[in-house]
């Protein structure tokens, strides 16, 4: 199977971290400090939302996530985004997800509140499994295509004149 991991950001409150731990899936955390993280495999991004609510969407995506996604290599491996938020903030609930989805042109796969529920955990595990299977199928198709084009028995046909 093609490798797929969870990449996530969690502030010092660790709400997102606790949610990711419940998933029981391979994961890498975007550092809270300024240390860079570079990912070389496909991943599903899980991020919290930081926004004041109402019409104030400033800062919805954390600086650490922005810095991570400013790396072209990291951007190209993102296969989808999941975001968390607090429904008390109304229109800005889980807003980081739609923002990142639009910027990266990847699907917004799920949104959940705070620590998430058992149902959220099951949904994200199912999304991960489907995405991993889909990524595997695409990789298999690509490998078959490469094999078909580069196999030594596949030589160009020569035209001979009589």
From Swiss-Prot:
Pfam families: Flavodoxin_NdrI
Any coiled-coil regions, as ranges: none
Entries under InterPro entries matching the protein: Flavoprotein-like_sf, RNR_Ib_NrdI_bac, RNR_NrdI
Highest taxon of the lineage: Bacteria
Listed GO biological process terms: protein modification process
GO-annotated molecular function: FMN binding
Stated role: Probably involved in ribonucleotide reductase function.
Homology family: Belongs to the NrdI family.
Protein name: Protein NrdI
Lineage, top ranks: Bacteria, Bacillati, Bacillota, Bacilli, Lactobacillales
Gene this protein is translated from: nrdI
